[in-house]
A protein has these predicted regions:
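Conserved N-terminal beta-strand and adjoining loop/helix that marks the start
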Residues: 1-21
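Short, well-ordered beta-strand micro-motif
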Residues: 15, 83-87, 103-105
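Residue-level detector of high-confidence beta-strand sites
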Residues: 24, 68-70
Length: 146
């Protein structure tokens, strides 16, 4: 019996600039950290660098993998988001068709209308205590693991 399963691979990145973090008001969704899908044949690292360039105009340097966010889709596919953090970048900030990007002070982040687990993502990217967040149907919410 095969243990292979369907997986959808994506990424997001918490870009930090001193006390500010970059967020995206994603069209039709709410506030998220920018990110996107991994293309066939592309490494996870290359994909997050490409996505940040496409969605924010910024070229991130040496993004650090902080952990994973994952859950099961109704069709049995496991959806995996690689969570990165970057403190070094260059370029000029610009929005894309994905949504408006803007800096927010960390202390103001909790007041934003974020979607599905973004506060937990920030906790993972800010702490070595956790390395994964999994959506548990049994617990009816996100579980931080580490």
């Amino acid at each position: 019996m095969s243990r292979a399963s369907l997986v959808e691979l994506t990424n997001l990145c918490v870009i930090c600039d001193d006390s500010r973090i970059l967020v995206q008001d994603q069209v039709g969704s709410g506030v998220v950290f920018p990110g996107g899908h991994v293309e066939p044949g592309e490494s996870m690292l290359d994909s997050v660098i490409r996505e940040m360039r496409e969605e924010t105009g910024l070229l991130i340097e040496h993004p650090a993998l902080c952990g994973l966010k994952d859950w099961m889709l109704e069709d049995g596919t496991r959806f995996i988001v690689a969570l990165y953090r970057a403190d070094r970048f260059s370029g000029t900030l610009r929005s894309s068709g994905e949504g408006r990007v803007f800096w927010v002070e960390r202390e103001d982040f909790a007041r934003l209308d974020t979607i599905w687990g973004m506060r937990e993502v920030l906790r993972i990217c800010d702490s070595a205590d956790y390395s994964e967040m999994f959506y548990s149907e049994e617990k009816e919410g996100w579980v931080l693991l580490g």
